[in-house]
UniProtKB/Swiss-Prot annotation:
Family statement drawn from the similarity comment of this UniProt entry: Belongs to the UPF0386 family.
Endpoints of the signal sequence: none
Organism of derivation: Parvibaculum lavamentivorans (strain DS-1 / DSM 13023 / NCIMB 13966)
Source organism, top-level taxon: Bacteria
Protein name: UPF0386 protein Plav_1374
Pfam family, one: YjhX_toxin
Coiled coil start-end: none
InterPro entries listed in its UniProt record: YjhX_toxin
């Protein structure tokens, strides 16, 4: 699957335990998507457009109103990256 650099970064942060919080306006449309890493840092590459592409491809999902997390398909799509911890 073709995944852009920004989508790859977001998926990698989610695969390591991060989550995406969304804020909706009065009409129920998503206007802000915030990616939070496991350590609590905010990922600047996660925009609403990136969020919509990941959700459209079913690489992320929300369960029972909780924040969005990576799915099994997302784990298979993400490329391995060296972890500099």
């Amino acid at each position: 699957m073709n995944i852009s650099k920004f989508e790859q970064r977001t998926l990698h942060a989610l695969a390591r335990g991060g989550l995406i919080r969304v804020e909706k306006d009065d009409k129920g449309k998503i206007h802000t998507a915030t990616c939070v890493t496991r350590e609590g840092w905010l990922l600047a590459d996660c925009t609403v457009a990136t969020f919509r592409r990941l959700r459209k491809r079913r690489l992320i999902a929300s369960k029972d109103g909780s924040p969005y997390r990576i799915t099994r398909e997302g784990l298979h799509a993400v490329r391995a990256q060296l972890d500099n911890r």
